[in-house]
Design a protein with these regions (language model features):
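Class I S-adenosyl-L-methionine-dependent methyltransferase catalytic core
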Residues: 1-216
Length: 216
């Protein structure tokens, strides 16, 4: 919600190439944005079947792209062998696939527009720590300018359980209670600073809402 309010306007085209359950397109439509969702295994009729490495959209058509890619091999995704979620984040194949996804995002995104990627690092007992976020940020930086890096706290009740903390001490690791949100910008020709794309009335509405909340 905050991303679309800050970086898009009404009737902008929002694209999610790894759409999952469709949250992105639902939020976009609620905010009067147009939306396209793609997924290798669509969960709804309004999500189109497509591989994020080959998005069926013309060049420079999207006004905003959000992507929440798979980022470890301890979660079962579609079960399809071609699914990026079936690739181990320990291997080169995963990062090659994500390079293709990021290149496609760059292709479909209009100049002077924003995109965001939501991801976490990964650690499993008996396996090396995988700084997936850092690797993907490096890839993103080949195409886009960095606008902001947000640490999004995961409100996961499991992390509060005592046995998780005991295990962390025993095996000498930290509990990872956050994801990265990388906000990136594709500059138009001659641009050096990202443009503020917010609409004046939406800014005013948000300021008023916060003032009412504070006073209340």
């Amino acid at each position: 919600w905050n991303l679309l309010k800050r970086y898009t306007k009404r009737k902008d085209l929002v694209v999610d190439p790894m759409c999952g359950s469709g949250t992105t397109i639902d939020v976009a439509r609620d905010l009067e944005r147009r939306a396209l969702g793609y997924d290798l295994a669509p969960s709804r009729k309004d999500i189109f079947r497509a591989d994020a490495r080959k998005i069926p959209l013309e060049d420079e058509k999207a006004d905003f792209v959000f992507v929440d890619p798979p980022y470890s091999d301890h979660i079962r995704y579609s079960g399809k062998p071609e699914c990026i979620g079936e690739l181990s984040a320990e291997g080169d194949a995963y990062y090659l696939a994500m390079e293709q996804v990021i290149s496609e995002i760059n292709r479909i995104l209009r100049p002077g527009r924003y995109m965001a990627l939501y991801v976490s690092d990964s650690w499993e007992k008996g396996k090396p720590f995988m700084p997936i976020g850092f690797y993907l940020l490096q890839m993103l930086s080949q195409h886009f300018g960095i606008v902001d890096i947000i640490a999004v706290i995961r409100h996961n009740g499991k992390l509060m359980r005592n046995h998780w903390h005991t295990a962390a001490v025993e095996h000498n690791y930290y509990l990872r209670g956050f994801n990265y949100l990388f906000i990136m910008y594709k500059p138009a020709a001659g641009e050096r600073v990202p443009q503020d794309r917010r609409e004046a009335d939406e800014i005013a509405e948000e300021i008023e809402a916060r003032a009412v909340h504070k006073d209340g």
